[in-house]
Swiss-Prot record:
<dbReference type="InterPro" id="IPR027417">
    <property type="entry name" value="P-loop_NTPase"/>
</dbReference>
<keyword id="KW-0139">CF(1)</keyword>
<dbReference type="InterPro" id="IPR038376">
    <property type="entry name" value="ATP_synth_asu_C_sf"/>
</dbReference>
<keyword id="KW-0066">ATP synthesis</keyword>
<dbReference type="InterPro" id="IPR004100">
    <property type="entry name" value="ATPase_F1/V1/A1_a/bsu_N"/>
</dbReference>
<feature type="site" description="Required for activity">
    <location>
        <position position="363"/>
    </location>
</feature>
<dbReference type="Pfam" id="PF00306">
    <property type="entry name" value="ATP-synt_ab_C"/>
</dbReference>
<dbReference type="InterPro" id="IPR000793">
    <property type="entry name" value="ATP_synth_asu_C"/>
</dbReference>
<comment type="function">
    <text>Produces ATP from ADP in the presence of a proton gradient across the membrane. The alpha chain is a regulatory subunit.</text>
</comment>
<keyword id="KW-0375">Hydrogen ion transport</keyword>
<dbReference type="Pfam" id="PF02874">
    <property type="entry name" value="ATP-synt_ab_N"/>
</dbReference>
<dbReference type="InterPro" id="IPR005294">
    <property type="entry name" value="ATP_synth_F1_asu"/>
</dbReference>
<dbReference type="Pfam" id="PF00006">
    <property type="entry name" value="ATP-synt_ab"/>
</dbReference>
<keyword id="KW-0813">Transport</keyword>
<feature type="binding site">
    <location>
        <begin position="170"/>
        <end position="177"/>
    </location>
    <ligand>
        <name>ATP</name>
    </ligand>
</feature>
<dbReference type="InterPro" id="IPR023366">
    <property type="entry name" value="ATP_synth_asu-like_sf"/>
</dbReference>
<keyword id="KW-0406">Ion transport</keyword>
């Protein structure tokens, strides 16, 4: 029989008395009444805030969105398969936040900031609230620096400035994502941090985009936020705000940032699904009444900050998918009214072989003109007008049997201008190359080149300038002005390439 020494017992009792903690922790808890379709109804949680994070017994997190008299409507940010009627819910006292920092660059994360690229955890110590207030009027500055996309048609006719919101709108499969990826690739030596937010897309599509960025070295300055089609609606709804928060961190550090929301149509659909399941009253096209606010508070976070705030900027390129080119539907008109212009992509132009398929007539940039570089502004002034007139004449000439010489000349030049603006995917052009191409077309220096050889001329001119006139390229890239000497050099180069092409054709 084991003998128990009294001093051992007293020592144990003393230790337990010393270790006794008399502090009482108060936790705000509730009970699940009903769960299904990504929504939980919870009784209790008396002190919960709107938008507060809550935690269920099985570890699933949710956001309290509907605060009603006798219950709280919570959207689940996970499968929630382990949640049952009667299980407890705990309020965390926190609003959703996301980790931020330089360690995010080159990574693929979900809308909660959790790495999903298999490269381990993120080594970040800072975080930002997913919902942050937009900069005020005094904290902003007017847009005055260019955000070069590398796409000649956009940089010449629909220029985008740093801090601008430019909508990319068009039907499915018209090259909306391609324009945005090209813009990211073009920031390689511009010291711009890019954030690509994929909302409700196929995981294969996101993997493909990520691979393209990695192959071309663009992932080093890019963060990918992915809420795939298989994710709960709550995560698809949160994804754009997460992307904005990650970009805001760099913006307030004084850096230029570019955020792409691909696409906000799917975010609006996820928000509609959540709202209908929460039994909020439906409005036009069954969207809730605050879907405009959902997008406006997101896009207002894009800004060009004042000198006192560090001169940083966030440029937003939201994408909207239309049905059969209908830009007068609810979500497209909402986002058009919030943004500072739109690039409209047409499926008819795309199918006719014009890539990028930009409809110049209804595309516009409302603030980017102030940010356009002088070199291209000087020569591209008439480009948009000439193309718009060409479209009208082309439609008219289908019914006219004989055309006068001036009209034929205008049609002939319009065809060549349109060919010049064709550009393969993943091949953005530098400013000097864009200036050279647009100059050749607008000044009528390639009117003798056959239309079918204009694309070849564009390629050969760029190669000729790189190999024979590198001083022209460096001058334009540094000074960003087309001086009389540079113009003379350019004219000589164009004449040389044209004569070589015509001689080889003969």
């Amino acid at each position: 029989m084991v003998s128990i020494r009294p001093d051992e017992i007293s020592a144990i009792l003393k230790q337990q008395i010393e270790d006794y903690d008399k502090s009482v922790s108060v936790t705000n808890v509730g009970t699940v009444l009903q769960v299904g379709d990504g929504i939980a109804r919870v009784y209790g949680l008396q002190q919960v805030m709107a938008g507060e994070l809550v935690e269920f017994e099985d570890g699933t997190e949710g956001i309290a969105l509907n605060l009603e008299d006798d219950n709280v409507g919570i959207v689940l940010m996970g499968e929630g398969l382990g949640i049952q009627e009667g299980s407890t819910v705990r309020a965390t006292g926190k609003i959703a936040s996301v980790p931020v920092g330089d360690a995010m660059l080159g990574r693929v994360v979900n809308p909660l900031g959790v790495a999903i690229d298999g490269k381990g955890d993120l080594a970040t110590t800072e975080s930002r609230l997913i919902e942050s207030p937009a900069p005020g009027i005094i904290q902003r500055k007017s847009v005055h620096e260019p955000m070069q996309t590398g796409i000649t048609a956009i940089d010449a006719m629909i220029p985008i400035g740093r801090g601008q919101r430019e909508l990319i709108i068009g039907d499915r499969q018209t090259g909306k994502t391609a324009i945005c990826i090209d813009t990211i690739l073009n920031q390689a030596d511009q010291d711009v941090v890019c954030v690509y937010v994929a909302i409700g897309q196929k995981a294969a599509s996101v993997a493909q985009v990520t691979e393209v960025l990695r192959e071309r070295g663009a992932l080093d300055y890019t963060v990918v936020v992915a809420a795939n089609a298989s994710e709960p609606a709550a995560l698809q709804y949160l994804a754009p705000y997460t992307g904005a928060s990650i970009a805001e961190y760099f913006m307030y550090k004084g850096k230029a940032t570019l955020v792409i929301y691909d696409d906000l149509t799917k975010q609006a659909q996820a928000y509609r699904q959540m709202s209908l399941l929460l039994r909020r009253p439906p409005g036009r096209e069954a969207y809730p009444g605050d879907v405009f606010y959902c997008h406006s508070r997101l896009l207002e976070r894009a800004a060009k900050l004042s000198d006192a705030m560090g001169k940083g900027s966030m440029t937003a390129l939201p994408i909207i998918e239309t049905q059969a080119g209908d830009v007068s539907a609810y979500i497209p008109t909402n986002v058009i009214s919030i943004t500072d212009g739109q690039v409209f992509l047409s499926s008819d132009l795309f199918n006719s072989g014009l890539r990028p398929a930009i409809n110049v007539g209804i595309s516009v940039s409302r603030v980017g003109g102030a940010a356009q570089t002088k070199a291209i502004k000087k020569i591209a002034g008439t480009l948009k007008l000439e193309l718009a007139q060409f479209d009208e004449l082309a439609a008219f000439s289908q019914f006219a049997s004989d055309l006068d010489a001036a009209t034929q000349q205008q049609l002939s030049r319009g065809k060549r201008l349109r060919e010049l603006l064709k550009q393969p995917q993943f091949s953005p052009l530098i400013l000097a190359e864009q200036v050279a191409i647009v100059y050749a077309g607008v000044k009528g220096l390639i009117d003798d080149v056959p239309v079918e050889e204009v694309v070849q001329f564009s390629r050969e001119l760029r190669e000729y300038l790189k190999s024979n006139k590198p001083e022209f390229i460096s001058k334009i890239q540094t000074e960003k002005v087309l001086s009389p000497e540079a113009e003379t050099t350019l004219k000589e180069a164009i004449a040389e390439v044209v004569s070589t092409m015509l001689a080889s054709a003969n």
